[in-house]
């Protein structure tokens, strides 16, 4: 190797040493599956609060979206369960939650789920914690 190549590799090593280390835990983030049961004419999502905490969204925002899409009434119990009036299949609830993830959680630039929802005046934004992008979304 020439002197120039050695200098190049030394500078490259210094650059990599100064770069922040990637957090592999946030890249391979897996979401819990929704635990959905039907009791009579009521659909209960047992791990709703845990799911909302994992995607960094308030329970009320997720509940508002899901109930609006299902055209149903519902409430969150003290132990974090979402109780929806009406009988809905797992596939329907999961479809709407996947749509919520793609619209209000996933970064449109880098596809990361490591985001926060920010309201600036009357405009809602998804701010990505991985790449720093800030994208407007439809208000909830």
From Swiss-Prot:
Molecular function GO terms recorded: translation initiation factor activity
Keywords: Initiation factor, Protein biosynthesis
InterPro entries linked: IF2/IF5, TIF2_bsu_arc, Transl_init_fac_IF2/IF5_dom, Transl_init_fac_IF2/IF5_N, Transl_init_fac_IF2/IF5_Zn-bd
Function: eIF-2 functions in the early steps of protein synthesis by forming a ternary complex with GTP and initiator tRNA.
Subunit structure: Heterotrimer composed of an alpha, a beta and a gamma chain.
Family: Belongs to the eIF-2-beta/eIF-5 family.
Protein name per UniProt: Translation initiation factor 2 subunit beta
Gene encoding the protein: eif2b
């Amino acid at each position: 190797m020439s002197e120039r190549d050695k200098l190049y590799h030394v500078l490259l090593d210094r650059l990599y040493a100064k770069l922040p280390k990637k957090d592999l835990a946030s890249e391979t983030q897996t979401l819990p599956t929704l635990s959905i049961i039907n009791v009579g004419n009521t659909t209960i999502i047992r791990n709703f609060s845990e799911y909302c905490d994992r995607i960094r969204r308030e329970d009320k925002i997720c509940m508002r979206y899901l109930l609006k899409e299902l055209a149903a009434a519902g409430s969150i119990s003290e132990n974090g369960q979402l109780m929806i009036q009406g009988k809905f299949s797992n596939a329907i609830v999961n479809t709407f939650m996947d749509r919520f993830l793609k619209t209000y959680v996933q970064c449109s630039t880098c596809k990361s789920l490591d985001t926060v929802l920010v309201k600036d005046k009357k405009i809602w934004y998804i701010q990505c914690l991985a790449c720093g992008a800030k994208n407007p979304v439809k208000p909830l």
